[in-house]
């Protein structure tokens, strides 16, 4: 038995010694920590990692594991069989055993006591040394077993079960060692974990509470509670349950919070932003009502009705502000509910007020949703109306529209009476030209302005502004003999030489100073009488066949007109045809243009200061269409000579009033259409282009007038074809500047007239603005773009072939008061 025991002990002896345990003198506690000298027989620290742990025998005695207890029992049984062999003990321990007698009945009790106490290994007491000597054999027998259980993979059976547990335990011991006391380590570690789980110390929930400790969900519920008080008790219980973790009383705390929130709002910030105690004193009274509800039972009967009312009112809130501030104003909602109860009675009265028109004024101060008609009436009574300038200007005098309509109706009534009293007005040619504005010209403007009876309403605005003009039309009928006399005189002088004719027309111009409307009628009759002679005298030149020309000839013709040769032959031919037509029309109508340039200083200043001639826009419409290109050059020049001689000493202030009727002799149909649009603009737009005479400076008008009266006085006595064709070439060079200014004005207006439908459409934001609209809106006009538009498209609308430069356009803009600028050059 002893031999076999020795073999067993020797075979396991290399495994028993700890591999990484250093020599005892190397880690002497006296040398390392400066401790008091200890007994030599004490066991040294097992490893460097255990230096910072309290010294213990836990490396050789496993702590708190039932599997290790079973192993110790096995080792005790083995140690009891091997106690007789002293040599084996000396070989196992590496040092001789003590001389004290060994008691075999004590080792089990001492070993149990050591496992329970786990006393420190570094002590200065003699008890520990004696205890070690007494239990030396038991420890020496237990150490191989424990070491085998840690290594546990060489000779002992059950390797699978014993391989995992000691290694896990060794790691667990190192983790528990620095944080827990050694005496109660296993029990306290397990008990603390159980207590944490039982008490509910959950760090994740604590972190969320730390980050968001204000109960936001309860705040939302409390806001809902303020509107409807019926379910407040249930919600207060839930609020107390939520705060049970914080140790609050579930019944008392929500009541106090609720009372405070009624006075000042749920939070301090809301009270500052939304509630002002001086403006809304109602919540305090509602708190007093709530206290009365708790004290008395009689008021409890009225509370259900009061609770139902806010729910009815809440559906009628239409704004976000009303929804938010509803819970702060309790009494105002009750007052508004009283109004709501009266609204069904007020509705039939509102319907009656549509017939009567006065019954609804008593209900205006109440908070009732009004019909659109009633809302419009209430807007009239407001002191402050915020809107655009046009709305505010209209609000200054509410009776302006009524007075305007009354004045329009009176003017229509007076006009119908005059028309019925003088039926010959529509029959006579002279009177029809002046009164044609009242009779209508058959265009879109006249068709659109009709009243209920179908009669024309063209003079709604014009007659209101120029109301004294009716006296000017009456003078035509009061003095018909003078008009007939002048007309007969001019008809008789159509065959006489131009000198006599000029003198007669000078007399006619002198009579026109007393009779403002007569010159337009006499000139129209004079032109009418000479249409046949002008047609016979005026030849129509033939257009050359540009299709037969070569490319070189076409380019030469284009250069003569001032254009560069184009690559496309077809486009070049079309361009030359347009240029030829425009040039011939200008040459045949140059005399008429000269008369137009001279007549701005013409006899319509003669009417009295308050009277504007009625034939202003209508004579243009009637006469220019009938006599577009049939005007004779000699007769027109003689009339301009006579008129200029009679009118030269006249008052220069007449230039502002005499421009529009002088366009009678302007022949081109395009210009007639433009002037027709100008009439509509003068009627509607206060900011429109004034007439050319108003735009040009006084010095330019006088210089231009005197410059062109000189060549017209050198006309021969007998008009013939040569004079009519050769004379227009002479005044053309000095007349380049001024006609171009007028042509630019015509081109700008012609563009707006070319798109009347698009200008009246609702989708104005998708349409590109015309130059006229930009000028009216005071937009800065870029000179480069405006010049290119005039040269490519604009001047072509008025049959003008000449081109303009940016400097000339700038002078035109400055003379018209148009805002213009050059494009800024990009820095390279």
From Swiss-Prot:
GO terms for cellular component: Slx1-Slx4 complex. It is found in: Nucleus. Residues 80-90, 428-439, 491-524, 710-727 have a biased composition (Polar residues). GO terms for biological process: DNA recombination; DNA repair; DNA replication. Residues 675-685 have a biased composition (Acidic residues). Residues 1-183, 261-364, 409-439, 468-551, 586-734, 749-768 are annotated as: Disordered. This is Structure-specific endonuclease subunit slx4.
């Amino acid at each position: 038995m002893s031999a076999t025991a020795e073999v067993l002990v020797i075979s396991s002896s290399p495994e028993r010694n700890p591999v990484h345990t250093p020599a005892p003198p190397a880690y002497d506690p006296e040398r390392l920590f400066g401790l008091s000298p200890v007994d030599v027989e004490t066991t040294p620290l097992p490893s460097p990692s255990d230096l910072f742990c309290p010294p213990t025998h836990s490396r050789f005695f496993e702590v708190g594991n039932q599997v290790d207890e079973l192993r110790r029992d096995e080792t005790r049984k083995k140690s009891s069989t091997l106690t007789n062999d002293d040599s084996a003990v000396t070989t196992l321990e590496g040092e001789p055993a003590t001389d004290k007698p060994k008691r075999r009945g004590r080792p089990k009790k001492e070993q149990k006591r050591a496992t329970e106490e786990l006393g420190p290994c570094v002590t200065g007491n003699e008890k520990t040394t004696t205890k070690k000597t007494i239990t030396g054999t038991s420890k020496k027998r237990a150490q191989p077993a424990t070491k085998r259980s840690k290594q546990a993979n060489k000779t002992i059976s059950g390797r699978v079960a014993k391989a995992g547990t000691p290694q896990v335990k060794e790691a667990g011991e190192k983790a528990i060692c620095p944080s827990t006391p050694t005496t109660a380590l296993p029990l306290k570690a397990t008990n603390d974990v159980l207590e944490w789980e039982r008490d509910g110390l959950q760090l994740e929930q604590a972190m969320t509470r730390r980050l968001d400790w204000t109960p936001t969900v309860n705040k939302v519920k409390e806001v809902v509670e303020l509107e409807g008080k019926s379910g407040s008790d249930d919600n207060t219980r839930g609020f107390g349950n939520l705060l049970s973790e914080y140790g609050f009383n579930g019944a008392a705390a929500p009541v106090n919070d609720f009372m405070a929130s009624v006075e000042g709002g749920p939070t301090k910030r809301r009270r500052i932003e939304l509630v002002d105690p001086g403006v809304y004193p109602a919540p305090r009274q509602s708190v007093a009502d709530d206290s009365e509800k708790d004290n008395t039972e009689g008021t409890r009967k009225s509370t259900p009705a009061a609770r139902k009312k806010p729910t009815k009112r809440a559906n009628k809130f239409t704004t976000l502000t009303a929804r938010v501030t509803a819970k702060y104003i309790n009494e105002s909602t009750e007052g508004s509910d009283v109004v709501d109860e009266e609204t069904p009675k007020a509705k039939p009265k509102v319907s009656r007020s549509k017939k009567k028109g006065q019954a609804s004024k008593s209900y205006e101060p109440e908070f009732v949703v009004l019909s659109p008609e009633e809302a419009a009436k209430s807007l009239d009574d407001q002191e402050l109306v915020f809107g655009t300038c046009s709305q505010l200007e209209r609000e200054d005098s509410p009776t302006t529209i009524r007075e305007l309509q009354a004045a329009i109706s009176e003017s229509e009534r007076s006009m119908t009476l005059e028309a019925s009293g003088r039926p010959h007005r529509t029959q006579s040619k002279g009177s029809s030209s002046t009164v044609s504005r009242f009779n209508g010209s058959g265009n879109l403007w006249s068709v659109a302005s009709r009243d209920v009876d179908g009669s024309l309403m063209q003079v709604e605005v014009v007659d209101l502004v120029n109301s004294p003009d009716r006296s000017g039309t009456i003078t035509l009928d009061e003095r018909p003999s003078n008009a007939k006399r002048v007309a007969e005189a001019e008809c008789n002088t159509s065959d006489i030489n131009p000198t006599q004719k000029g003198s007669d027309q000078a007399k006619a111009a002198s009579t026109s100073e007393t009779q403002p409307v007569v010159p337009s009628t006499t000139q129209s009759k004079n032109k009418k009488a000479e249409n046949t002679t002008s047609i016979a005298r005026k030849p129509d030149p033939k257009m050359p066949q540009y299709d037969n020309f070569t490319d070189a000839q076409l380019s030469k013709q284009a250069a003569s007109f001032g254009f560069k040769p184009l690559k496309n032959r077809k486009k070049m031919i079309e361009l030359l045809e347009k240029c030829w037509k425009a040039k011939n029309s200008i040459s045949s109508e140059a005399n008429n243009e000269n008369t137009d340039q001279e007549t701005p200083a013409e006899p319509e200043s003669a009417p009295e200061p308050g009277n504007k001639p009625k034939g202003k826009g209508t004579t243009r419409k009637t006469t220019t269409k009938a006599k577009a290109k049939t005007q004779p050059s000699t007769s027109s020049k003689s009339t301009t000579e006579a008129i200029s001689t009679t009118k030269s000493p006249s008052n220069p202030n007449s230039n502002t009033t005499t421009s529009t009727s002088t366009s009678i002799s302007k022949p081109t149909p395009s210009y007639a259409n433009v002037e027709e649009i100008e009439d509509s603009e003068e009627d509607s737009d206060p900011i429109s282009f004034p007439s050319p005479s108003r735009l040009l400076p006084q010095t330019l008008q006088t210089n231009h007038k005197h410059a062109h009266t000189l060549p017209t006085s050198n006309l021969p006595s007998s008009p013939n074809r040569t004079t009519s064709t050769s004379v227009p070439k002479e005044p053309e060079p000095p007349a380049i500047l001024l006609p171009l200014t007028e042509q630019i004005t015509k081109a700008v207006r012609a563009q707006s007239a070319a798109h009347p439908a698009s200008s009246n459409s609702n989708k104005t934001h998708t349409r590109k603005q015309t130059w006229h609209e930009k000028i009216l809106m005071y937009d800065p006009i870029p000179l480069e773009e405006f010049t290119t538009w005039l040269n490519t498209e604009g001047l072509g609308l008025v049959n003008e072939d000449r081109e303009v430069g940016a400097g000339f356009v700038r002078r035109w803009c400055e003379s018209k008061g148009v805002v213009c600028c050059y494009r800024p050059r990009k820095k390279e």
